[in-house]
Amino acid sequence: MDGCHLSRDKLQGDGEGCDLKTSDYLKKYGVRLKKHLGQVFLSDDRIAKRIVKAAELTPEDVVVEIGAGAGTLTEELAKTGARVIAYEIDESLAPILQERLSKYPNVELRFEDFLKAKNVPEGAICVSNIPYNITGPLMEKIIEWKFKRAIVMIQKEVGERILAKPGKKTYGYLSVVVQTFYEVKKLFDVSRSCFVPNPEVDSTVVDLKRKPVDLDFEKFKKFVSMIFAKKRKTLKNNLRPFLSIFEGVDLSRRAEQLTVEEIVELYEKWRRALECSRG
């Protein structure tokens, strides 16, 4: 089978025979890709359809897409009848998006930087092909805006970090902050040949479902950053300014050896102690 094709675990291909609409649109409007934006556009409708199917959207849902690009995924989202709010920072893509989406009254295009967005509806569903160059900050924004669910396509390496378990080399800050607030499940891998232009790495689609967790995210990520600041050092080293708070706690282990639950327990102890010290 030519082009991007579906194997058991991975959508892949040789780059020929993929849906060429993305390339055609870019040529039609003379759009030049901007490297500093990490622009990698999905070019296979079948992948978009599979992602949207996994989201199980209804017309009552509000969907946020981060990085609409050339609109391949946006158009499939629009077909569900859900209210779609699509963010795109590159206004040169406006003619493409307007041509592809003008017949869908349920789509709202916002040409702005999602990282600076002020009025994102909380409790919405995020379905996106996340821009590679800002994956970490965008994952934090997904947590901050309390999306009840997120189905996102990200670099395979980042997917491995998000899914990592304690003791694994890839387990770290991103693993902990995402897994604290979301149940995380890998859906499938996507070959680099199914994008325009072809990136240097493959991608992974993950499904995040919000947990009923009530934590101050800003304080929590500060604590997690602190214990992972020097990954090979023990908790005793990384928490040295706060040793009195953790009297009686075994701090001989490294953060990468702790479960998410153990880290949350340490955080709560740290948070309560700081609040008491401030009166």
From Swiss-Prot:
It is found in: Cytoplasm. GO terms for cellular component: cytosol. CDD domains: AdoMet_MTases. InterPro entries: KsgA/Erm, rRNA_Ade_diMease-like_C, rRNA_Ade_Mease_Trfase_CS, rRNA_Ade_methylase_Trfase_N, rRNA_adenine_dimethylase, SAM-dependent_MTases_sf. S-adenosyl-L-methionine binds at L42, G67, E88, D113, N129. Its EC number is 2.1.1.182. The keyword Nucleotide-binding does not apply. Its main location: cytoplasm. It is an enzyme of class 2 (transferase). The keyword S-adenosyl-L-methionine applies. Gene3D superfamilies: Ribosomal RNA adenine dimethylase-like, domain 2, Vaccinia Virus protein VP39. It catalyses: adenosine(1518)/adenosine(1519) in 16S rRNA + 4 S-adenosyl-L-methionine = N(6)-dimethyladenosine(1518)/N(6)-dimethyladenosine(1519) in 16S rRNA + 4 S-adenosyl-L-homocysteine + 4 H(+). One of its GO terms (molecular function) is rRNA (adenine-N6,N6-)-dimethyltransferase activity. One of its GO terms (biological process) is rRNA methylation. It holds the Pfam family RrnaAD. Keywords: Cytoplasm, Methyltransferase, RNA-binding, rRNA processing, S-adenosyl-L-methionine, Transferase. Belongs to the class I-like SAM-binding methyltransferase superfamily. rRNA adenine N(6)-methyltransferase family. RsmA subfamily. Specifically dimethylates two adjacent adenosines (A1518 and A1519) in the loop of a conserved hairpin near the 3'-end of 16S rRNA in the 30S particle. May play a critical role in biogenesis of 30S subunits. This is Ribosomal RNA small subunit methyltransferase A. It comes from Thermotoga maritima (strain ATCC 43589 / DSM 3109 / JCM 10099 / NBRC 100826 / MSB8). The gene is rsmA.
